[in-house]
């Protein structure tokens, strides 16, 4: 499964990067995030528990996962490796590229799917990736864009 979400944000890369790495603030900025907890802090990131709603019309489906998060200020990029939850084994990278007077952010999710015999890969490619991963990532990116462009981010 591969999902890619991209947005251009009218703000300098350092400001966008601060919002991307300040995951504990996301529930304040992003209404679909139920909570974010830093379970273990490390100099370059840590272990983070995240929970979000995936809306389906008026109904929200609860999602939850734990990731090892690594921040690379030099790249600039933020990397995640899902270590608990249905998406265990998923690799995620947020890449930030300066572009003119703004920043292009690309979020890439890669995953071979849950360890379910026969249907794991199909479920990842047809349901989990396009419906859940893209559904949450696209909302996260749009919310970060709104917050940064309004000056509300970290």
Show where each model-derived region lies.
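Hydrophobic ligand-binding cavity/cleft-lining segments
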Residues: 1-45, 154
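Intrinsic-disorder/low-complexity, polar/charged segments enriched in Ser/Thr/Lys/Arg/Asp/Glu/Gln
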Residues: 1-8, 45-47, 64-66, 77, ...
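Hydrophobic/aromatic beta-strand elements that line small-molecule binding cavities or substrate pockets
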Residues: 5-7, 36-38, 64-71, 82, ...
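Short loop segments at secondary-structure junctions
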Residues: 10-13, 73-75, 99-101
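Hydrophobic pocket/interface hotspot
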Residues: 16-20, 26, 69, 105-107, ...
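Glycine-rich portal/gate segments that line the openings of hydrophobic small-molecule binding cavities
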Residues: 38-86, 138-154
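Beta-strand/loop substructures that line and gate deep hydrophobic ligand-binding cavities in soluble
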Residues: 81-138, 144
């Amino acid at each position: 499964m591969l999902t890619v979400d991209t947005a251009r944000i009218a703000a300098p890369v350092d400001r966008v990067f601060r919002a991307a790495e300040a995951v504990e603030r996301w529930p304040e900025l992003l209404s679909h995030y139920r909570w974010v907890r830093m379970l273990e802090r490390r100099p370059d990131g840590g272990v983070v528990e995240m929970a979000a709603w995936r809306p389906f019309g008026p109904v929200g489906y609860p999602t939850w996962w734990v990731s090892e998060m690594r921040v690379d200020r030099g790249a600039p990029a933020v990397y995640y490796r899902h270590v608990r939850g249905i998406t265990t084994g998923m690799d995620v990278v947020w890449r930030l590229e300066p572009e003119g007077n703004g920043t292009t952010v690309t979020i890439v999710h890669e995953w071979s799917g849950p360890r379910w015999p026969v249907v794991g890969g199909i479920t990842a490619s047809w349901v989990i990736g396009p419906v859940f991963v893209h559904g949450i990532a696209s909302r996260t990116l749009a919310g970060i864009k709104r917050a940064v462009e309004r000056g509300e981010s970290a």
